[in-house]
């Protein structure tokens, strides 16, 4: 989220200007934009057809979050970070159903509170260099992100 807000300072100004009003959509956009899970694999429990492709019970299918969260049929301007995006049917937390992430509400709350405190204490915080990324087949993450800010008085 910090990297996105640093790369799109206009979006940060929108959110910081009406933190409470924009927080619900901003949090969802951070989840869509920076989902830490790369993919999830499942086994089909029955035969299905999806977009003209037949798949049999027992076949393995993979949901690629980065692809689903940039789907042009699902999102208007999917390659734009938009803190007011609504609706935002992202695939974060598994997209719903039996495998929905039990920690989803906690994660949303952590994002909201963390950015609320950053906005309050160091509102001009911004990335100062590219992040060092975590290289993993399953997790899309940032190891370190250098940031800078003006010292509060």
Map each language-model feature to its residues:
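Cytochrome P450
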Residues: 1-153
